[in-house]
């Protein structure tokens, strides 16, 4: 009994210390000198920084392509050894259907000094007769005969890049040479010039698009990529309307007649009308005067934006080909350590609302759900840009399968929702419909690597709908190095993500501001790309899926957490960067997967309620001691 008496004051004192300690910041703070990207740069300075980032992406993608090609050649050697010529033809034909970049393969018999060439049905005979191609293939053949590897520099033929690579078998009796297309470099450059806003995008005049200042809706002209910083884009003959009371069929016919248009497209409580001859301003005046709606706003276009110590044996080092050399982003976010706590769950689905996904990519096999195509509902949500496939790979590429890249989660499934077309852009309507569809079909996390600088109530309604269904919404802030809030990232229901580089500096292109929640890696991130290929891309589009993957891991290890609790937990388990605490350049800091999952293992109580929660626990303990 006497022991209980002296335990009570001891517990009380300990409680006081604990409460004081818990009120102090618990984040790991790392102060590293940060480049002054926030200082207003002239357009030429910003352009040069972005060009440098693009060059890094292209260089990394070039090396990734070569590493992947070498692995393909080794696979071909294993599969074709001992096969007949007909079997080899059949194998190569089938391989080239899924690996179209492997333009030509040569089987080299070193004992006989002979080689046999296999090309796909789409091969161009004149390409093989080109001097550079012939010389490179001859050099590759000579190297194999000498039991040496071969790799040519890149060269251009008719505006397309190629290289030749060859490998001898370990016993020196045969080898394989390949002519490899590097069309992926052209695709990456084209996409990243848009994604990093190095060019005016989208071009005015395409699809009758207007550019306006997001605050005033006054017309502005976008001549350079830098001009996108203060621009939003909308369809000049369309309007989004939310009525105070939904119109009946007769009223819709009346509106259609007044506007010279088809009946409006309806999504939730909102309608989109497209007029054949009226501008947005005329449409806005018509609805404001005649219908007194809740809102009548432009139909905006959205664009892509890509401790308890753990034992050494618990740190997972996957065998994926590109992991050790190119996936700096996973160790930087403590993802490997986090896998010791959770590798995810197939029951927690991440929707990628984007350009679609390459559903046939071998490094995404079994990870992709059927999804939905908003752009063309009759078709599957296949990716015709590359952006969505790259985002999906960051989240859920197969881990430890010996090829390509490792995703952040092992078991979480990706639900592709295609809302952006082949140009990488989409409408408010398509993005909103995609969000609602994902929320209605079981997504627990929605990734939005897209944005615009104008608020759209229509889109906000869709965001609130998903949030009210307990979905964690994660969005990229944008790539214009501006403090201007980007949407949907700046909506209060959305978790906003900006980008860091490998040095934990804010990436030179990354947007910033008081609305930013956290940072995640976004510079030269290696991931999956259409056509069974891989690419390194930069952008807050690449940072956002890191956080979506973390949210999925958190919800996998603790399914009882609400979306708000998941978001609070991620904010409070970061590597603090810059000024201690929250700041506009780094938000709360860079995500720490291990720390977040460690926190999620425990029953989660929001920090502001923790003193009360702790007090209740202590009262319970004291009561138990009194019995």
Regions found by a protein language model. Name each.
Residues 26-86:
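Juxtamembrane extracytoplasmic/periplasmic/luminal helical "stalk" adjacent to the first N-terminal
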Residues 310-413, 434, 579:
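Active-site core segment of subtilase-fold serine proteases
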Residues 345, 419-493, 503-506, 530-538, ...:
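Substrate-binding/access-modulating region of protease and related hydrolase catalytic domains
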Residues 392-395, 419-420, 444-445, 449, ...:
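Hydrolase catalytic cores
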Residues 160-201:
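Conserved beta-strands of PAS-like sensory domains
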Residues 2-4, 212-230, 253-325, 627:
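Autoinhibitory propeptides
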Residues 362-364, 369, 406-408, 499-541, ...:
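Catalytic-core environment of secreted peptidases
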Residues 62-66, 232-236, 290-349, 362-363, ...:
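Protease zymogen maturation seam
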């Amino acid at each position: 009994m006497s022991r209980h008496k002296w335990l009570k004051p001891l517990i009380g004192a300990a409680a006081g210390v604990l409460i004081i300690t818990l009120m102090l910041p618990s984040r790991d703070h790392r102060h590293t000198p940060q480049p002054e990207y926030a200082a207003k740069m002239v357009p030429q300075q910003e352009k040069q920084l972005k060009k440098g980032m693009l060059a890094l992406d292209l260089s990394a993608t070039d090396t990734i392509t070569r590493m992947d090609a070498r692995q393909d050649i080794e696979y071909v050697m294993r599969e074709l050894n001992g096969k007949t010529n007909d079997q080899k033809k059949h194998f190569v034909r089938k391989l080239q259907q899924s690996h179209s970049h492997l333009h030509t393969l040569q089987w080299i018999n070193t004992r006989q000094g002979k080689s046999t060439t296999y090309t796909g049905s789409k091969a161009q005979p004149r390409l093989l007769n080109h001097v550079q191609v012939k010389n490179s293939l001859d050099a590759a053949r000579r190297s194999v005969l000498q039991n040496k590897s071969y790799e040519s520099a890149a060269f251009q033929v008719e505006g397309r890049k190629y290289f030749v690579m060859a490998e001898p078998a370990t016993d020196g009796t045969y080898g394989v040479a390949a002519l490899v297309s590097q069309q992926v470099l052209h695709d990456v450059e084209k996409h990243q010039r848009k994604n990093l806003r190095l060019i005016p995008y989208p071009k005015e005049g395409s699809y009758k698009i207007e550019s306006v200042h997001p605050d005033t809706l006054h017309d502005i002209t976008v001549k350079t990529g830098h001009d996108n910083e203060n621009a939003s884009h909308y369809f000049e003959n369309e309007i989004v309307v939310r009525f105070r009371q939904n119109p009946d069929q007769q009223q819709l016919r009346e509106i259609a007649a007044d506007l010279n248009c088809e009946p409006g497209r309806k999504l939730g409580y909102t309608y989109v009308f497209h007029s054949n001859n009226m501008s947005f301003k005329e449409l806005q005046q018509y609805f404001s005067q005649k219908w007194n709606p809740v809102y009548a706003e432009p139909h905006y276009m959205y664009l892509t934006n890509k401790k308890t110590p753990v034992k050494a044996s618990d740190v997972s080092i996957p065998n994926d080909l590109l992991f050790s050399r190119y996936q700096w982003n996973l160790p930087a976010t403590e993802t490997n350590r986090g896998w010791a706590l959770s590798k995810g769950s197939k029951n927690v689905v991440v929707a990628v609302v984007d350009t679609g996904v390459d559903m046939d990519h071998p490094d995404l096999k079994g990870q992709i759900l059927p999804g939905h195509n908003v752009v063309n509902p009759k078709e599957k949500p296949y990716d015709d840009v590359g952006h969505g496939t790259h985002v999906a790979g960051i989240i859920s590429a197969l881990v430890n399968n010996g090829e390509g890249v490792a995703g952040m989660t092992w078991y979480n499934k990706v639900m592709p929702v295609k809302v952006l077309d082949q140009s990488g852009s989409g409408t408010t309507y398509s993005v909103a419909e995609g969000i609602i569809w994902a929320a209605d079909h079981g997504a627990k996390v929605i990734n939005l690597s897209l944005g615009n600088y104008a608020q759209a109530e229509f889109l906000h309604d869709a965001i609130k709908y998903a949030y009210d269904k307990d979905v964690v919404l994660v969005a990229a802030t944008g790539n214009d190095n501006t403090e201007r809030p980007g949407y949907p990232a700046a909506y209060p229901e959305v978790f906003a993500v900006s980008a860091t580089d490998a040095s934990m500096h804010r990436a030179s292109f990354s947007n910033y501001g008081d609305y930013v929640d956290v940072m995640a890696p976004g510079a030269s991130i290696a991931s999956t790309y259409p056509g069974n290929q891989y690419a390194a891309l930069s952008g807050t589009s690449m940072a956002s899926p890191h956080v979506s993957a973390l949210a999925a891991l958190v919800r996998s290890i603790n399914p009882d957490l609400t979306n708000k609790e998941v978001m609070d937990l991620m904010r409070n388990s970061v590597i603090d960067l810059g000024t201690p605490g929250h700041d506009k350049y780094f938000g709360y800091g860079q995500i720490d997967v291990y720390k977040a999952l460690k926190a999620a293992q425990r029953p989660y109580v929001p920090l502001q309620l923790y003193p009360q929660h702790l007090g209740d626990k202590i009262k319970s303990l004291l009561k138990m001691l009194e019995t």
